[in-house]
From Swiss-Prot:
Keywords: Cell membrane, Membrane, Transmembrane, Transmembrane helix. It comes from Streptococcus mutans serotype c (strain ATCC 700610 / UA159). The chain crosses the membrane at residues 7-24, 28-47, 68-85, 90-107, 120-142, 147-169, 178-200, 211-233, 254-276, 291-310, 317-339. It is a multi-pass membrane protein. It is found in: Cell membrane. The lineage of its organism: Bacteria, Bacillati, Bacillota, Bacilli, Lactobacillales. InterPro entries: UPF0324_pro. Belongs to the UPF0324 family. The keyword Transmembrane applies. It comes from the Bacteria. The keyword Transmembrane applies. This is UPF0324 membrane protein SMU_2059c. GO terms for cellular component: plasma membrane.
């Protein structure tokens, strides 16, 4: 069987996993399509052992379709609009991201956790959940088990945030503006930010959803410096190894070019919008990006050892809980310092 046919067969398989996961995600946005895709892939992997006809396509989807999805994510970012509307939230965003990443780094060292899993949980918790994990995973060369663990942890605390935060905000007396900032800076995934803000609006007959979404988009911009920083760190490590082994390392081979394409897509979106192009024009690209992420998560699920995931998932959950609590406290603390709450 030719390699092209193997790739096509694997792509079709991942598409068939992504399709029901996509519709399940639409029906249950708190869970989200990527989580459904991972679990469907893991369930199928229990029975689907002989993969010689699809292995190449599964590997292609988990790597290159994921990178393609990240590039398309850039078409959802109008840099000027996000920076203009979201600049009031920048101090809170910087504080929450910094504290979460620092905590993830310290806990990884303290408890000797897996470096990649700690990085993905830290980035996913502090920036934008599954999208940040999708952008970061190829940069640090994370494997399927590490990605699946991280996505699962993010999913758990997304649900908790959507269930708890509206009541918590009510109890501590947050204003509508304050809750929009809280939801946008302390909830991981965009769909969960939407669900959390919608729950608040249902209780208060308000409209915090737009504000929370803009704050969330502003927070998403942190993908750029974080992934670039991790990229240069990976280059540094690779060069160090290459020097020890007496061979040179070419920057182009280890630097993830898809991150630069992501930035380029964001710049194109910003320029075209400034020239009068309707933002609706980019909606199909954003939707395609989300679906490609779901396909990639299905492929990752197929390559994930569910037994290992269950056995080693405890550490990731503790790390995720720690990051989630710190982000919540820092978000509220910064609002208090800034006189918003």
């Amino acid at each position: 069987m030719s390699l092209k046919f193997q790739k096509l067969s694997g792509l079709v398989l991942c598409f068939l996993i992504a399709l029901p996961a996509w519709f399940l995600g639409q029906s249950f946005p708190l869970v989200g399509a990527p989580v459904f895709a991972i679990f469907l892939g893991m369930l199928l992997a229990i029975f689907y052992k002989n993969r010689e006809h699809t292995e190449a396509g599964i590997a292609f989807t988990s790597k290159y379709i994921l990178q393609f999805a990240v590039v398309l994510l850039g078409f959802g970012l109008n840099l000027s609009q996000v920076l203009t509307v979201g600049k009031t939230s920048l101090p809170i965003i910087v504080a929450t991201i910094s504290s979460s990443l620092l905590l993830a780094f310290l806990l990884q060292k303290w408890f000797k956790l897996d470096v990649n899993t700690a990085t993905l949980v830290g980035v996913g918790s502090s920036i934008c959940g599954g999208s940040a994990i999708a952008a970061t995973a190829p940069v640090i060369q994370a494997d399927g088990d590490e990605i699946a663990q991280s996505i699962s942890v993010i999913f758990l605390f997304n649900i908790l945030a959507a269930l708890i935060f509206p009541t918590l905000g009510d109890m501590i007396g947050l204003s509508n503006h304050g809750f929009a900032l809280f939801a946008g800076t302390a909830v991981n995934d965009t769909s969960s930010v939407t669900a959390t803000a919608a729950a608040w609006d249902g209780l208060h007959h308000s409209n915090t959803l737009d504000g929370a979404t803009i704050v969330k988009l502003t927070r998403t911009l942190a993908i750029i410096p974080i992934t670039l920083g991790l990229s240069f760190y990976q280059v540094y490590k690779t060069k160090k190894v290459g020097k020890n082994q007496q061979h040179t390392v070419k920057l182009k081979k280890v630097f993830p070019m898809f991150i630069l394409y992501f930035i380029l897509a964001s710049i194109i979106t910003t320029i075209l919008t400034a020239l009068g192009v309707n933002p609706i024009f980019f909606t199909p690209l954003k939707t395609l990006s989300k679906f490609c992420i779901v396909m990639a998560m299905g492929a990752i699920g197929l390559n994930t050892n569910i037994v290992k995931l269950v056995k080693t998932g405890g550490q990731a959950i503790v790390l995720g809980a720690s990051c989630w609590i710190v982000i919540t406290l820092v978000s509220l603390g910064m609002q208090h310092l800034l006189g918003i709450w």
